[in-house]
Amino acid sequence: GDGENGNGNGNGNGNGNGNGNGNGNGNGNGNGNGNGNGNGNGNGNGNGNGNGNGNGNGNGNGNGNGNGNGNGNGNGNGYFDDDDWDDFDWDDDDWNDNGNGDNGDDDDFWDDWDDDRFDDDRFDDDRFDDDRFDDDRWDDDDNDDWDDDDRWGDDDNDDWDDDDRWGDDDNDDWDDDDRWGDDDNDDWDDDDRWGDDNGNGNGNGNGNGNGDDDDDNGGYAFLRRALARASARARAAASAAGRSRGGSGGSGGSGGSGGSARARARARARAFASARASSGNGVNGGNGKKRSYTSY
């Protein structure tokens, strides 16, 4: 506090004390004594103590200088006048003012949270009732909706469950009857592919060592040799049949395996052609007609 009085008193006393601490301490107490005390203190601390004492009060206190200071304590004397407390207005208006003229215990403070705050256009029903959520979006005839009848029941081939896609005659559908039942050799389950007479039956293709090209001359060399053997067998069989009973010539042996399916088909066709050509009616057991086969 300011302790007006303080002055003189204390003097003598305080002395030394304050010092130690130097600074006003001692005073600590009285500090107040407004008087010079404390102040100066820091400085000369107590020093002067004893001395000057009184001075302290001298208020002016040279204290500044140190001396006296301590004394300053003036022991408190400087008392805090109750009147000072009486001067402070404890009315709510003084200490509970929120700066807006409203007191903390004033109902006006809560009136600021007016219902209008939660009743503005931000929560207007129109916000969620606009055209973005229009039924026409989900029920239109465009093909850009995932559940549009026009998409699933149309005749386009771009729908995975379109009847026109699965039942068409194109060969681009994995379950198309035309693909699985055709006569092409490009289907894995085609009867013509698996049940043909290409040269891998009866051991013709790889029996008797014919299937392995020990001479390492390549697939075509092997194929030529296999066809030549088949042609020779066909001619021999036809000749024997013609001499004995003039019956039809035996069918030519199948071409050896190897080479493409198409090459095998050609080889088979030529072998049969050779067999048919070499057969003939024997005349009195005469030799049947012979026809040389040109190698592939």
Swiss-Prot record:
User: Where along the chain is composition biased (Low complexity)?
Assistant: 233-243, 270-281
Coiled-coil ranges per UniProt: none
**Which Gene Ontology cellular component terms are annotated?**
extracellular region
Top-level taxon: Eukaryota
| Composition bias type Acidic residues, residue spans | 80-96, 103-194
Q: Where is this protein primarily located?
A: secreted
Instruction: Kindly state which keywords UniProt assigns to this record, in alphabetical order.
Output: Secreted
This one is known as Aspartate and glycine-rich protein
